[in-house]
Amino acid sequence: MRHFTYHSDVVVWQYIFESGAATNYITRGRALKKLQLSLKDFRRLCILKGVYPHEPLHKKKVNKGSTENRVYYYAKDINFLASEPIIRKFREYKIFLRKLTTAKAKRDEERIKTLYENRPEYQLDHIVKERYPTFESALRDLDDALCLLFAFAVLPHTKIITSSLVASSRRLTAEFNHYIIESNSLNKVFVSIKGIYYEAEVMGERVTWIVGHDRGMGHVSEVDFSVMATFAEFYVTMLEFVNFRLYQSVGLFYPPKLAFKSDKLEDDDQAEEGRVYSLACPLSKFENYEEQIDASIGDEVDNVLNEKLCDVEKRKQLFANYRFWLNREVPKDVLAIIIRSCGGLVSWENCPAAQYYENDAQITHQIVDRPLLDSHKNISRCYVQPQWVFDSFNRRSCLSIKKYLPGAILPPHLSPFSSDYDTYEEQLNQLRLLSKASANVTNRMETEAENKVQERKKIQKEKEVPIINVNKGRMHKENLQKKLNEKGHELKLREMLIPKKRRRVYSKIKRGIKRRVHEEKKLNEKRLKMLKAAD
């Protein structure tokens, strides 16, 4: 389509929808035709390459005057995808499926076996290097990778979620947990209803991820696992690169090797893999490995580094002289990570890499989550609930075990991710003191009022009051309700004088004030409930 304009007796032809925004975007249908891919393969390719749809500012210009809703991509992104070698593998896999269907129809078992052995496979190494040119860029995107792979590590096998993907997710997450333990990089842990939140400082980058609680996972139909499986497939390759680099930085062998062999006569690969997954045994390091610290740093950076080193030393020595035994009902992985990060030893029943057993006399603490019978208790060890480990780690000091005994009502488990975590306990103590002081004051006032009443009665009995007719006087009392009504009426009159363009802003401010008052009231009620429960 074209139209023309006149400029000093010269006709200039202008083609509509062939320049500007109309050429910068391309619809998904045109992209599929250009790449000659199915919608399923196109989605996989976009996820792997990190290409996402975009919303144009002027849909009518891009869609050639039409207002129909469509999915748009940048044309340069589609041109970028056209040169991807994985597209050829997708086409080969399509041919493989066609040949496999023919062989199954003919019941040719040898042909089927040969096709399965030679089926096309693709590698994602070059895509990982392309999307993360530096190691720091990979660490910045590590949060999503860990959250997804920890979720896939406990999912049941299905047609979409293959056993190899679940096994790879479990292996890589266990390797990352070992790095967190060996490098003492864990900073915060918080247990919530959704799961367990972790925060660690990995090579200068803060990484936060969530791990679900240990429970059986049933069939979930509300989630599109085909999309998530593609993300997990990419993150598996990415985490392999990251784990290798992290293990090299702290002097560990990769793949990981245990520091000592178990007493059990199990030399097969599965037994070794189970011992690595248990997180109870340390890993072996390179010989003559020394941790390198950059000496060319300024004074300000040096002070920050000293604070971090002091914090790391506190964490290392927190459980240094303790041995823990975990009962069957408590979560193993999270407690093993925290205890071993703080220098302690941990073991449990049927632990693949157990260094000691339940009857060991050197055990100092036993973690239980249900009341024990007196006949089953050992006098030489302390019995505490799991929250004691979490709270002690977040406070960087071993707390008193009186509040964490089996069967006791636990204190509130505070989140270390909140900004007022350090001052919250001080506020709770102040509130307790204030509540006690207010209770004493009210009791004292009541007793004083009773004493005054009794004294007045005695005085009235002792004195003989003459009979005098006295009329009661009338006190002028202000009607508070009338005052409030007048103030409200004045406020409404002032609101009516607000211009129309300012009225919406005023209503937003008013709603915000009401919401803050309501939230403050709810928080105060919750705080009083927590104080009553703590007392």
Curated annotation (Swiss-Prot):
Domain BRCT: 314-406
GO cellular component: nucleoplasm; PeBoW complex; preribosome, large subunit precursor
Protein purpose: Required for maturation of ribosomal RNAs and formation of the large ribosomal subunit.
Stored InterPro entries: BRCT_dom, BRCT_dom_sf, PES
CDD domains, alphabetized: BRCT_pescadillo_like
Example of a GO biological process term: maturation of LSU-rRNA from tricistronic rRNA transcript (SSU-rRNA, 5.8S rRNA, LSU-rRNA)
The keyword Cell membrane belongs to this UniProt entry's keyword annotation: no
Gene name per UniProt: Bm13949
PANTHER family: PESCADILLO - RELATED (PTHR12221), PESCADILLO HOMOLOG (PTHR12221:SF6)
Native source organism of the sequence: Brugia malayi (Filarial nematode worm)
Molecular function terms from GO: ribonucleoprotein complex binding; RNA binding
The protein's name in its UniProt record: Pescadillo homolog
